A protein has these predicted regions:
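C-terminal catalytic domain of Rieske-type non-heme iron oxygenases
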Residues: 67-270
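Rieske [2Fe-2S] iron-sulfur-binding domain
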Residues: 2-86
């Protein structure tokens, strides 16, 4: 706040202005002070402001030059407000460099070990991964596994969609990284021999894992996670079960990344 330096995040929006929660100073969307009880504010410096767009249930902030902000760069989250999809997720504060999370999300071989009880399986390690750069702003890694047993998480998903969970499946993982810090991962399984990734909806369960990362410091980040699915979208119990499962999975990542960050900080010359 331009008045006494209080965090404006503790304020509230009043009549289209942001009111400081300390002494009631109000600033407009440009950061200019407009009013304060019993105080002249014309000489107050501006609070810093940013280019902001609210879209798809998220607030997107461009921290650099406002003139360089391009809302067209915001990814198209096709499932938002779409009754054919269901979505839920959460937020973690993680004490690790955000780049460690990018590495984690783009190399899913760690699932075999970190997430052995849910989504991990040996075939992830055994199946070659393809990496490609698309245009100037997207890196894609993909892995397709055929005629394997579904891991526990995907068996649950198959059952929730009325599909047998005790038959071989084809599984896929397609990770899409767009700098600086968001990753969308297409994941799913289909009954083996039904077309895999391209199988008809009645033979598969598939989802989009949402990973949006806001770097905080050199050693910390805010991690927005979630899963959008296009099977049985109206069943709230399935949504809750998937969210619970994801929370456990990403908590395992949190533990690993925070300890990795600690080691990197303790042994910088390693």
């Amino acid at each position: 706040c331009p008045h006494r330096g209080a965090p404006l995040s503790l304020g509230k929006v009043c009549d289209g202005h942001l009111q400081c929660g300390y002494h009631g100073l109000r600033v407009d969307c440009t950061g200019k002070s407009v009013s304060m009880p019993g105080q002249r504010v014309q000489a107050f410096p501006k609070a810093r402001s940013f280019a902001v767009v609210e879209r798809y249930g998220f607030i997107w902030v461009w921290p650099g030059d406002k003139d360089a902000a391009d809302a067209a760069l915001i990814p198209n989250l096709q499932w938002h407000d779409n009754p054919e999809w269901a979505y839920d997720g959460g937020l973690f504060h993680i004490k690790a460099d955000y780049r460690l999370m990018i590495d984690n999300l783009m190399d899913l071989t760690h699932e075999t070990y970190v997430h052995a009880s849910s989504i991990g399986q040996a075939e992830i390690d055994e199946t070659p991964c393809k990496t490609e750069v698309i245009g100037e702003s997207e890196v894609v890694t993909s892995r397709f596994m055929e005629n394997i047993e579904a891991p526990p998480f995907w068996k649950m998903a198959l059952r929730s969609n009325g599909l047998a969970d005790d038959v071989p499946v084809d599984r896929w993982q397609v990770c899409r990284f767009t700098p600086p810090s968001h990753v969308l991962i297409e994941v799913g399984v289909a009954h083996a021999g039904k077309g895999g990734y391209d199988a008809a909806d009645e033979h598969k369960v598939y989802s989009m894992v949402v990973d949006f990362i806001t770097p905080e410091t050199d050693g910390s980040m805010w991690y927005f996670w979630g899963m959008a699915r296009k099977f049985n979208p109206g069943d709230a119990s399935v949504t809750a079960a998937i969210k619970q499962g994801q929370h456990k999975i990403f908590s395992e990542d949190l533990e690993m990344l925070e300890l990795q960050q600690r080691n990197l900080a303790d042994y910088p010359d390693r």
